Amino acid sequence: MIKKAIAKVVERIDLTEAEMIEVMDQIMSGEATPAQIASFITALRMKGETVEEITGAARVMRDRATPIRVGKGVLDIDRDDINIDQETILDVVGTGGDGTNTFNISTTVSFVVASCGVKVAKHGNRAVSSACGSADVLESLGVSLDVTPETVENAIARIGIGFLFAPALHGAMKHAIGPRKEIGIRTIFNILGPLTNPAGADCQVLGVYREDLVEPLAHVLHKLGCKRGFVVFGMDGMDEITLTRETRVAEVTREGVTVRTITPEEFGFASCPPGDLRGGDAAGNARIVRSILDGATGPRRDVVLLNAAYALVAAGKATDPAEGIRLAAEAIDSGRALAKLEELIALTNE
């Protein structure tokens, strides 16, 4: 199938979701050769990946990931009705590769949101283009990455947050590592990670590194069954909601996708220069994360509050971002967010 797929994509013919599933199965099973993998993902990038192609690839990666099982069906009470449903699991994650070298915003947000009572399955990896990815900063903070899937499940169940280290849970990706490194360009694999949470997170805030990915990835999340989510791109290039400029936000609900542009000012925050959000290496970013969770004020806290607000809306803990900002501020100022970090450090080092 992959030979036929390469021939089609070279002619700029889109693949169906079913065709993409077949190709990805060949790639992730080791059936496709390195040359075929490199040719395919390069041609696909030149053509431009469609919603159907990304969705098909994400389905295969999800199916082949080591599963993190969380929740066995709980009484879910929201403002409209009462029903028995799987426990809500949230992921706050970016594609990385935005080149802005900010501190680890989504990682900081994860502890704030978890301390508000949301189950967080934080999916992440080491640095892509910055000096410090989520795995790097967590390791520097004292969180052990060398844990079993059962430990991650236990962390989410017991304390409400666990870190899903992508290389440990996506073993089938090994077949694509060589071709990806050798061609050295961004491909579909750069956007698949945030779509393939092994815990099956059904609520999400997903940051992307290009504006033209916002709406397509929102439609992918919708097709993959996301209950509520936001795909965001800061117009300064950040794969987060930014304070320096406007942010494009695509909201995903059961009904579909809506897109709008937001500004920090509409939520009561002052805009700031990019340097105010910049980070450094793992040790430096760990100090920044801890200082924010310990109550430090300024633009870094503000950007965490705004991103946490949207995460709380996605998880159903806040009706709107304004309520989310208030809840996030309370979580930090009460000490609960910092305590959540300490709990994860302790649990992963037991």
From Swiss-Prot:
Q: Which GO BP terms sit in this record?
A: L-tryptophan biosynthetic process
- Record has Magnesium as a keyword: yes
Described by its record, this protein's role is as follows: Catalyzes the transfer of the phosphoribosyl group of 5-phosphorylribose-1-pyrophosphate (PRPP) to anthranilate to yield N-(5'-phosphoribosyl)-anthranilate (PRA).
**Residues that bind anthranilate 1, according to the entry?**
G94, N125
What organism does the record attribute this protein to?
Geobacter metallireducens (strain ATCC 53774 / DSM 7210 / GS-15)
Q: Which gene encodes it?
A: trpD
**Binding of 5-phospho-alpha-D-ribose 1-diphosphate, residues:** 94, 97-98, 102, 104-107, 122-130, 134
Note how many cofactor molecules are bound and how: Binds 2 magnesium ions per monomer.
* Gene Ontology CC terms: cytosol
Q: What is this protein called?
A: Anthranilate phosphoribosyltransferase
Q: Can you state the subunit structure given in the record?
A: Homodimer.
The coenzyme or cofactor needed here is: Mg(2+)
Molecular-function GO term, any one: magnesium ion binding
